[in-house]
Amino acid sequence: MVQTPPTAAELGLMQGYPAPPDKRVTQENLLDPPNNRWAFQHMRELMATAEISRGNGPVHALPERRRDLSDLSFTAGDGTRRTVAEMLALSYADSLVVLHNGELIDEQYFNGMGPASQHQMMSVTKSFVGTLALQLASEGLIDEDALVIDYIPELVGSAWQDATVRHAIDMSTGIRFDEVYDFGEGDVARYGIASGFRPIPEGWSGPRNLEELLPQFLKEGNHGEMFHYVTPNTEVAGWIIARVTGKPVSQVISERIWSQLGMERDAYMIRDRIGMEMAGAGLNAAARDLARFGQLLLQDGEWHGQQVLAPEVGRASCRERV
């Protein structure tokens, strides 16, 4: 029997006024277990953020056909049989929302989270930014075959000097970057500090924002030859979106997606110290609203009779690229 992990409240995190020193969650320790049990539902209390407005339109309620999936079993990656309930407990999940044919089948919340909670989405953010880049390309606002530096001359001399926009979107750039999440002194640590996700350490002499960070990455290998998962590629895509629209990514998400789908809650993006938004990992949103976005892609960009995205964009977002 897998035990349900303790909640942030049961652990006493940020309880009391003020919370005891050993129960305080800060920007310095938010990633350290168990502090992330509290932090991932309270990111805007720890760092600068930008609002993603749902607008003033009505909520598009999800049709429901409820079924409890807790006892549904499957074979896990290690070959053991697990139930959905066991998987959720072992992964310290805060929520589960399942749609089938556009209907809400199951919805479960843990650790104090509920339908209105805005949760840190980490790299799910990339799906929104990539989709927007493809949509703007379909409208002729972005040329996927153009060089990145045609839009962002600040990146001349960097890894993106001779990379195309498509290389960045597809994460096929040849770049010297090690995506290892140790948050010590490596590339991801530098990215976390520059993006505003992590505080600036005492004595830090490195980049203090994304504008300073991105030009420092150098080329390694050839572009377009292989998939190389590099979060800064999505930061570049977000920068291009902001450059061609004249608006921050949060506003483009609001206008193009959030206000179009009848979302239940506003969302928000983490931003750095000069207002550049964390396009690679900065989204915080409610679980049902993430499900709505997924359904939009499955419906080839159509939502309640409105073509929110070009059909080819929805299809491309659900297709494996080789």
Question: Which role does the model predict for each range below?
Answer:
Residues 1-113, 142, 170, 174, ...:
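N-terminal leader/targeting segments and the immediately adjacent pre-domain N-terminus
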